[in-house]
Amino acid sequence: WVLVVGLVILVMLTILAMALMKTARLEEKMAGATRDMNLSFQAAETALRRAENFIESQTAESIFDTTGEGVYNQETDEPANPFTSNWDDTDSKAIAGALEGVTSSPRYMIKKLKKIGESNLTITGYGDDDAPRPTVFRVTVRGTGGTNNRTTLLRSHYSKVF
């Protein structure tokens, strides 16, 4: 009788251990997916900062009058759907210097939209015909995580007075 009770307890412990192993494996996969998502978001944020720094570092607006290396002028359309874009050197710019843990370098596209404030009102609300008007840019970035299957796309608008 003791042998039967011992075997039943052993079978129950084995089933419990297998269920715990399955749960631990699932939690490990979820933690890996979360880490991968965080990496891709950090890569996209890095690309966004670099693209905005690129815009800010320009002293003349004329660099945005041509298209190439991730820059699109007003007349040239960037890829309509960033999800299906190739994100290669023909339509975007890669961030120099690799980030740790990501499989592909983050990339960005900058589209020059237009000058805002076409009227003679300035930010302060006072009329001034000679006030410089800011130019608005649409910045689209892509970051990947530990695998190319995990991507994050961000889009922002940035303005600068030249």
Can you annotate each of these PLM segments?
Residues 1-6, 10-162:
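Terminal alpha-helical segments
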